């Protein structure tokens, strides 16, 4: 069982990326994170939500769901969409790979998430959507 959890969902508009980032940051604040820890989580959320909007829904309207749970000092963060899915997860997770080169995307989203979180798991099914499960243990003291 979790010590605390929250769920939000919102329309896949780029304007909502900052809402998602701030919402998760506010939830995580109960762990009294360092500024670096908080920045890491906000950056990972930003990348995950941006991926859902640009790649999952291809800038069409859909719903992005975020679930955040705390167990002890660990944050479990799930970002999910019902978009087009990822055809080849291994390829998509390679640094500098982008499925949208015409948009001048950097292809670093998954690399950023892996760098700033302790773990990243990607589940995806073509034409059904993608689910990212990220975890981070907070070392700061309450």
UniProtKB/Swiss-Prot annotation:
Keyword ATP-binding attributed: yes
Keywords for the protein's UniProt record, in alphabetical order: ATP-binding, Kinase, Nucleotide-binding, Serine/threonine-protein kinase, Sporulation, Transferase
Species in which this protein is naturally found: Clostridium kluyveri (strain ATCC 8527 / DSM 555 / NBRC 12016 / NCIMB 10680 / K1)
HAMAP family: Anti_sigma_F
Role, per record: Binds to sigma F and blocks its ability to form an RNA polymerase holoenzyme (E-sigma F). Phosphorylates SpoIIAA on a serine residue. This phosphorylation may enable SpoIIAA to act as an anti-anti-sigma factor that counteracts SpoIIAB and thus releases sigma F from inhibition.
UniProt family annotation: Belongs to the anti-sigma-factor family.
GO annotation terms (biological process): asexual sporulation; negative regulation of sporulation resulting in formation of a cellular spore; sporulation resulting in formation of a cellular spore
UniProt-recorded name of the protein: Anti-sigma F factor
UniProt keyword ATP-binding, yes or no: yes
Catalytic activity, as annotated: L-seryl-[protein] + ATP = O-phospho-L-seryl-[protein] + ADP + H(+); L-threonyl-[protein] + ATP = O-phospho-L-threonyl-[protein] + ADP + H(+)
